[in-house]
Amino acid sequence: MPFRVVRDCLLLGVLVLPCLAQEEIRIDAAAQSAPFPHFWEQMFGSGRAILSLRESYREDLRAVKQIADFRYVRFHAILDDEVGVYNEDEHGNPVYNFAYVDEIYDGLLLNGVRPVVEISFMPKKLAFNPDALHPFWYKPNVSPPKSMERWDGLMTAFARHLLERYGEEEVAHWYFEVWNEPNIDFWGGVPRQKSYFELYDHTARALKSVSSRLRVGGPATAAAAWVDDFLKHTSEKRIPVDFVSSHGYADDTVENLLGTNEDVSMRDRLCSAVGKVKGQMRAAGKSNLPLLWTEWNVPGMDELRDTAFVGPALADTIRQCDGLADALSFWTFSDVFEEDGPIAQPFQGHFGLRAKGGINKPSYYDFALLHRLGEQRLKNENPNVIVTKRKDARLVIAVWNYVEPGQRGQARSYRLIFEHMGLEAAEIGENRVDEEHGNTLAAYRGMGSPRYPTEEQVRRLNAMTALGTPETVRLSGRSLDLELGPNALVLLEVKPGVPAK
């Protein structure tokens, strides 16, 4: 990627400030374009199923829906004993109860969100090993079923109930994902892969026996594992697969994600793994299937998920994964989340976009900014920019200064040079998230880091850090100079003026 470096040095008295290298980024409004579906905001993860009955969960859902307009939510444990789906009478006969299931899914649909039905975990009375408990705080059972016949019966009854309550036309838009990360300690079957494939086969066939329109898929593995084996197995056995799903995080090891010991930066790992899986799908003749990446997040070290780092990491992931995944599901939209127990206080590095109490994190504002990107992406080879166009002909441009975790970053200076567009009287609006804008963590610390913030404190924090109206910025000729601090994300909305004469 060619660029020109310009040196601007300032002399203040006898102090010479370091020169800041300025990188030129050419923004060509006539560049080749391609459809740009917002795959990063179609789906979010959340805390387990039963938490969705809490008003705090639903408040966070509505808040994130407002800024990202996501369509699907995925969570664990719809079959967990606390949901009460499966029991047995005194004679050992199955007894089903879908009362909480209805409340859970009713709540999602009422707020304009559909479920990704992750079929997990095992009801204790259906478990082959009732003591096979995962170490999560709520101790889900990860055992295979004691009887595949009874499992088939549960799946069939579950699907029939959903169709009776919500209608086939609605439920046909849902996704049914079989289990969660069966390649690690979420699945206790032996041998692990073979027993999971048996579970998948039975589940897919049972669901399809109720309606061929139900969409079922997997393998929902951690670290991009098993996809090639899964596709080979289901093809050979003629088992239905309507989508492929897997997981991967930016701080997963390169060996686990990619099967190599090469030095791959955290910036590049996730989309390299997504690309690997997409390649396996092509090799298996299944590239036509949707690829749902049903869990991902930025690195969790140093509480980065509470900081401005999320913005550049998210934007760069969008840039690299565009065209590879149909949905990239951020884990999670909210810190109403209890895998390690109730969260004690806000800002402890948890996954969500909203901290405990409904505090908007910088990541919340990052998603709000990137939601504004257009429906067409214009070709641009610079690794720190996404250029898009809206239907109203506005250009919407994301620019960022990514700093690799564990490194000290510096400010970066960019000169954006606009080509092939009328710029006389052009209007440019700028919003940004960085250390000074949208930084709720800093505001929270400035408030004394209250362990149990009051509603008024939460209101003040969100008001203090809200993005607000875009700032109007001016061009110098056909160019715009920007300076971005470490891990800054800037969004520009350019309304073209009349062509220059």
Language-model region placement:
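N-terminal secretory signal peptides that target proteins for export/translocation
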Residues: 1-5
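Bacterial N-terminal signal peptides
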Residues: 7-18
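Non-catalytic accessory regions flanking glycosidase/transglycosidase catalytic cores in CAZymes
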Residues: 21-175, 194-223, 237-239, 282-288, ...
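A generic structural signal for short coil/turn motifs at secondary-structure boundaries
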Residues: 50-53, 185-190, 253-256, 301-305, ...
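Active-site-proximal loop/turn and secondary-structure-junction residues that shape catalytic pockets
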Residues: 79, 121-123, 180-184, 220-224, ...
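Short acidic/His/Gly/Ser-rich catalytic and metal-binding motifs that mark active-site loops
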Residues: 81-85, 124-134, 184-187, 251-257, ...
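Short, conserved phosphate-binding/catalytic loop or strand-edge motifs used
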Residues: 174-181, 294
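Noncatalytic carbohydrate-binding groove/subsite architecture in carbohydrate-active enzymes
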Residues: 192-328, 345-346
